[in-house]
Amino acid sequence: MEDLKKTVDDINSRDDIEFVIMAGDVTEFGADWELEAAHEIFEELDVPYYIVPGNHDTKWSESGCNSFARIFGGTDFAFESHGILFCGTSSGPNMRMGMAQVPRESIIWLDSLISATPDGMPIIYTNHNPMDASLSNVAEVYDVLKKGNIQLTLAGHWHTDNLKNYDGVPAIVGRSTLRSTPPSKVVGYNIITIDTTTMHLTVRNHESGGKDGKVWAEVDMKPFDPSIQTTRPDYSLNEKYPNATTVWEKQETADIGSGFASDGTRLFYATAAGEIKSIYARTGGDVWSYKTGGRIYSFPAYSAGRVVCASTDGNVYCLNAKNGRLIWVHPTGKGIVACPLVEEGVVYVGSSAGEFYAIDLMSGDRKWTFDGVKGFIEARAVADDEKVYIGSWGNEFYALDRKDGTLVWKWNNTGSRMYSAAACWPVISGDKVFITTPERATRALDKNTGEEIWFSKEPNGRESQGISLDGKELYVKTMLTNELVAVDAVADTCKIVWKCPLPNDQDMDLAPAPIMSNSNAVFVPSSIGKVYAVSRDGSRVIWAKKLSNTVINHIMPLDEKTVVASTMDGKIVCISYTEN
């Protein structure tokens, strides 16, 4: 925060700056206290400022991305100055690791904004992520921006100064304010000057407390040429696997950041806009919808005719599965991004208040609270007859007594909290509980003591893992080598059973979604909208299908020949397949 304060003081010492645009990453971890501290400094500016969140503000957000909007007044902005429209949107990824993605709600807002902008008005657009292929839905954003006279995009993320041109649109990727920014290694910022007579734009670096640097970028603004084509994702994969066909598809108006539960007839899911919904599994037809008071990144759970889901408004909701009517609501006092587990009439779920709860499914009464959680909880717990197991974004993993919530043991992953066992869903087999953490390490912990039975980086997974139906194999999706790895879950060492290459041309795959299976296939998610079905023996990819260019949240088998999947940009797709 010291570097930001020095930057603000320097800006206030000048009389030639009209406004400030901050292109995201105002925090390291998106914690409420970090956002509040940054906001306090920004509020000291003597000129207006406009801000969008970056990936560090949204990926690890304990509030489910609510606090940024609450503290700064929103995640998108638009204003006019000297006949130019300046606008900006968030680019996430919100809560789920993957490529950046402008939320669907923001694209809809941006489209309405550009449609209402006078013809020919120059547009300068800000997004934390550069407008290249690392922004998963960049083509959709350009489709909107190119309806108007887009002149320039501004971005951060790289922490260094770059002048680029993406799909015919000049792009300024600017330095951070941090003194660690190369090559200068001093606190600073960029000053953009626009001559509105000649429409000539210059960018110079300024060292806080020092002199203006030389101009390092120049852009001549002129009417955008709409004949320049936009680069689009490649969907040719779908032609290679005709044995996988779409049964039905549904597009939400908001992002989806979670997966499904089912009663066999209906599917239950939630949107980032805060709605819990039910649709028919075989047709995708709407059944009911229930609106909560916050955003939702929680997977619903189904049991005994009831649907349980948590919201970032701080409540756990229990709804009638048939009609969506509220049965009970359980307040926790702080936002929840965790996914509930229901076992034997008890709901187990963590929150962002440093707590983990057991709630009676029938009454909604709290049975016990464990208040020793460091950080916040994101994943779904796993339970055996005696204990429930869950990790947190405080580098800790807990085994709690199911009867009273007593801490049985605690494991700690030393080092950065970004290596926490928090996004992976833990799985159990025999006397082991398995976790895969972001330093690309997989561990088997003793369920009774928490001691490491084995540790290995050979599976090369980041967070996405699952267990076979018979509990004999642990599945891990690799981060860098585009493979599904099966590990012997019975052995007391990391014994690789097989590796199956996946038809993925990305340099890395970060999607944290759990790996599911049925009797004939293992279903593997990706961060670029691809779904893979791998044979149970790992000998081949049965089929693969690209649904989107964004993160796959969940792939749930409906039967032995049908699955349903959701994508971060709000798609739900039902797929039927054969084993040809």
Where are the model-predicted features located?
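N-terminal active-site segment of His-dependent metallophosphoesterases
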Residues: 1-37, 118
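Extended active-site neighborhood of metal-dependent phosphoesterases/phosphodiesterases
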Residues: 32-111, 115-119, 140-152, 162-174, ...
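Binuclear metal-dependent phosphoesterase catalytic core
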Residues: 162, 169-237
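Extracytoplasmic beta-rich repeat domains
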Residues: 241-261, 287-301, 328-343, 352, ...
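Short loop/turn segments that connect beta-strands within beta-propeller blades
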Residues: 280-284, 320-324, 360-364, 401-405, ...
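Blade-level signature of beta-propeller repeat domains, shared across WD40, Kelch, NHL, RCC1
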Residues: 547-580
